[in-house]
Amino acid sequence: GNHSDLTDDYAAVRGEMEAVAKAMGKNVLREVEYEEFFQSLDVLKEKVNDRALLRAFHFFGENERVDKAVSSLENNDFDSFKQAITESGYSSFLYNQNVYSPKNPTEQKLSLALCISEKLLNGKGAWRVHGGGFAGTIQAFVPNDMLDAYKETINRVFGDGSCHVLIIRPVGGARVID
């Protein structure tokens, strides 16, 4: 996807979340308790737009999903990790709405890549928009026995070289040795 002319889209994500926080007397959403937010929806709906509320729902849920993903990895539970990644992706699409630009709704390459990923990987892998969204890349966790077919499909639909396979190291990029 093309990242040109997306500054307003990226700014709207932050701006709308901050508008919800300000409507609750705070500066940022991390200063707001979810239950207080949820109980204030009727009042908030009069102060901010609907998309801002949806993005706030994404924010609160995403923090929980990150905790779940970290815990899953710490406990070597890759199935739960994949579930958290996929749930995060659905939330990005439905609530954060950062998979395509509302300025160009007919260009939805990321949406199509996510759809294809779901059809190919459902129940076996995980997929989500990567980075800030609107254009660019998705992230997919593909089982080794499905990798060739997945890569072939993505490259066939989006062009040769569209699918880049990354190997995840079992340890971080830096390691402290005592």
Where are these regions (language model features)?
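C-terminal nucleotide
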Residues: 1-128, 140-178
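N-terminal pre-core extensions flanking Radical SAM catalytic domains
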Residues: 135-138
